[in-house]
Amino acid sequence: MQYTFPNYYKEFSCIAGACPDTCCAGWQIVIDDQTLKKYQHFKGPFRNRLHNDIDWKQHVFRQYNRRCAFLNEENLCDIYTEAGPEMFCGTCKNYPRHIEEFEGLREISLSLSCPEAARILLSQKEKVHFITKEKKTKEEVYDDFDYFLFTALMDTRDMLIDIIQDRTVPMQKRLWKLLAAAHDFQLCVNKNELFKWEEIRKRHEDSGYGDRFCSKIYSRINADNIENSSAASACANTPEQLFKKMWKAVVPEMEVLRPGWQKYLENCLTPLYNGNTDPQPDSGNLYSWQKSEFDFSYPDWQIQEEQLLVYWIYTYFCGAVYDDEIFAKVKMAVVCTLFIHELNVGTYLKNNRQFKLDDQIRICYQFSRELEHSDLNLNRFEELMTEKEIFSFENLLKIC
């Protein structure tokens, strides 16, 4: 069995009571069958509490006010203190370690939903790389696992990460290239033409980011603008209006895991989407000006944006071996990262133009919790990338 993990993986150590939040609230923690049996046979004074605060039908810990029943007032776990760490279920033992399973391979990441894991990721200045180690285990075989597609996805992901990490190129062009390549790979899968993948990879690598590449992108954007050429359509296709529509397409579809999440979004985004124009002449609307101001005031975002894109692509891209949804996964990576940027700018404005690493960490882990702590949300978000016209290839090119 091969195990792959990011180079910063072993930097993680739980900070327990010093954590600004808790991983034991806002989501249902599923208990694995092996641990359930241990709980059933547990003896001692903690037995009654253990039995009463587990939903044995659903195989989850009960919750009170969205908090795990075993989470005490100090935000520490009573199972740990009363029964010992060996009584943790698989989820609690592993978190924030996230594992994607493939035949003969486990890909491990640190979930962005953990504040300390988010801090480690966002503090990385060097390009993230991945380490693979091998352990002797019983050979496994997955029924209907398309190994040919999987190896193509692995090679393609390496290429996409190389694109994201090319710091000689402005991020806008990297995002364009990322989307364009994923778009073409998806067409190949749709036509069952995997044999063309190598040709597509080479074409995108050779085309670089020069005038020819940019002219193709501009042509795609302009063709879409001509198709929607009325004054009303043009106004509705500005980056600001597109982002507003994207939020409106996503938020109502999501299960709310923590009370106050939608109010938090409103408070963050209202300063950014207030509809005014910049009082300074010829400097564009206030929206664009404020985003540029944030990027100048918080230069760390340049690298943090890269690290977030790599995080999403590494974690989810190769899952396309199970559903063929290549483009949707890349779209999701781009949209999630740009949504976080919008929340950054709104927070910067709300906080009187102050923004620090702690703000970035808080935004990232809260966003991740609402998305990644719910399979329903994660799956629905990805589905929306394909279902909703607002997330079209052309619209995403416009907001990069």
Q: Where are these predicted regions, by residue range?
A:
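General N-terminal leader/first-domain-start detector
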Residues: 1-46
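Short linear interaction motifs
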Residues: 4-5, 73, 320-323
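Short, compositionally biased low-complexity segments
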Residues: 11-18, 127-132, 236, 312
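Local cysteine-cluster metal-coordination motifs and their immediate loop/turn environment
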Residues: 11-29, 63-98, 111-118
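Short, charged/polar micro-motifs that form catalytic or ligand-binding hotspots
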Residues: 14, 82, 146, 150, ...
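Membrane helical hairpin/interfacial module
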Residues: 27-74
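Internal, well-ordered alpha/beta segment that forms a basic, Gly-enriched binding/recognition surface
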Residues: 83-187
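Hydrophobic, aromatic-lined core segments that form the binding pocket/scaffold
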Residues: 171-400
